[in-house]
Design a protein with these regions (language model features):
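An N-terminus-focused feature that recognizes amino-terminal "leader" regions
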Residues: 2-74
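Short, flexible helix-coil linker/hinge segments at the edges of structured domains or between repeats
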Residues: 70-82, 142, 151
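Short beta->alpha connector loops
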Residues: 47, 97, 117-119, 231
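Surface-exposed interaction/gating patches
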Residues: 14-15, 19-25, 156-199, 210
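Amphipathic alpha-helical segments
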Residues: 26-39, 99-108, 179-194, 241
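Vicinal oxygen chelate
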Residues: 2-8, 14-23, 55-60, 65, 77-172, ...
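Catalytic micro-motifs at enzyme active sites that drive phosphoryl/nucleotidyl and oxygen chemistry
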Residues: 44-46, 53-54, 75-81, 112-115, ...
Length: 262
């Protein structure tokens, strides 16, 4: 944890959700569900007012969301136009005090883009241009510090949709940048965790339930997700059968590379 947040007595922070964006929900949602053996737990009708539709699938206790624009002029649509459809949209963290983390972000030059207050849920979204690569959101649900506790964005019974026979966990997020060390340090300052090194020597941010690895690439994007699965070959074959571009133990879907690990 960095000094600024340590001084403020900051508590826990965990990866709660990854959000991808696609021009249309289908076939992306059906592909993810079929290939990865996951189930949709919720479709939030409230996002329609933002010109969006969405679906969420639990990967153990982390939620994987896909959003798609339903009308012109949405933030998600602008993101697609800017990136050409490559790159994840949001990294969402649960914590004890989103407002404190929002204040800290402002102090280091990262603007707050949106505050969502739907009791018992409270979220602070940071400006993607200042975050670089993707949106960052911090949120907290009152009375729900348990990883299997209530989480309103995923619906009332999201836990019942957890399926672990094919995909067991989302264990890593890959971030790409021409300056991976600089992006890692920037995200580390925002989130409040120190930069370490991965087994392969890349800058890494370690959370209690996953890690962010930063690799060199032409543009700053969330480029990949790593999943622990029961049978790599079986999932890889399922991706091929759905028409995904497969390379080794990875395939492209929803604007990012899905990497498979045993």
């Amino acid at each position: 944890m960095n000094d600024e947040l340590r001084k403020r007595g900051s508590g826990y922070v965990r990866l709660r959700q990854i959000c991808l964006v696609a021009p249309h929900l289908e076939p992306v949602i059906s592909d993810i569900a079929d290939i990865m053996g996951l189930s949709v737990c919720y479709r939030d009708g409230n996002v329609a007012k933002y010109g969006l539709e969405n679906a969420l699938l639990p990967v153990d206790t982390i939620l994987l969301e896909v959003v798609a624009p339903t009308q012109p002029g949405t933030a998600a649509g602008r993101f697609l136009d800017k990136t050409g459809g490559r790159g994840g949209y949001m990294a969402i963290f649960c914590c004890d005090d989103p407002d404190q983390r929002g204040r800290h972000a402002r102090e280091i030059g990262v603007r707050i883009a949106n505050v969502i207050d739907h009791a018992p849920y409270h979220g602070v979204q940071l400006h993607p241009r200042d975050c670089r690569a993707a949106f960052i959101e911090f949120n907290h649900t009152e009375g729900s510090d348990d990883v299997l506790g209530p989480y309103p964005p995923a619906g009332p019974d999201w836990q019942k949709s957890i399926a672990k026979d094919v995909t067991q966990a989302l264990v890593g997020v890959e971030m790409q940048s021409p300056e991976p060390q600089g992006l890692a340090e920037h995200w580390g300052r925002i989130i409040g965790i120190p930069v370490s090194k991965s087994k392969t020597g890349e800058p890494e941010l370690k959370l209690p339930n996953g890690s962010f690895q930063f690799v060199r690439g032409e543009s700053e994007i969330m480029s990949g997700l790593t999943f622990r699965v029961a049978d790599v070959a079986k999932v890889r074959d399922a991706a091929k059968a759905r028409g995904c571009a497969v390379s080794g133990d990875s395939f492209d879907l929803g604007g990012v590379t899905f990497r498979l690990a045993a």
